[in-house]
């Protein structure tokens, strides 16, 4: 699954009254460039995550990742949003990762605190997401 396919999957899955959830996508540079009529490169500020989601009364920033790793995750997978994730967590906010393993063909879920504590994790340390 490509990163874009993974993001679209999460967006479609959690934009659902059945799951008592709604999800909103942050526009990124790729989106803005695709929509630009001139075709010129557009540069936007970095977003704190891919989405913001409310589910069952709890709002959280949501980052979607895909990986080819057989063993688990490493800090490079989370580096881009780490500073913004930490700012959100330090202010008492919620941050969630949905990670798709292309080797295991399944989704995992992790809190921002779990990843911040140690981003180098084995798959057996993660909670499997059944969606």
Q: What is each of the regions a protein language model found here?
A:
Residues 51-53, 57-69:
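Conserved catalytic cores of phosphodiester-cleaving nucleases, focusing on short active-site segments
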């Amino acid at each position: 699954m490509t990163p874009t396919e993974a993001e679209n999957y999460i967006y479609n899955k959690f934009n659902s009254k059945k799951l008592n959830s709604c999800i909103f996508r942050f526009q990124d540079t790729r989106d803005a460039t695709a929509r630009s009529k001139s075709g010129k490169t557009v540069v936007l500020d970095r977003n704190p995550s891919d989405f913001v989601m409310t589910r069952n009364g709890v709002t959280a920033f949501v980052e979607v990742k895909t990986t080819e790793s057989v063993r688990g995750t490493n800090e490079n997978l989370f580096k881009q949003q780490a500073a913004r994730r930490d700012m959100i967590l330090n202010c008492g906010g919620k941050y969630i990762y949905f990670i798709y393993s292309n080797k295991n063909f399944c989704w995992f879920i992790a809190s921002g605190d779990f990843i911040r504590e140690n981003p180098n994790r084995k798959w057996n340390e993660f909670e499997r997401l059944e969606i």
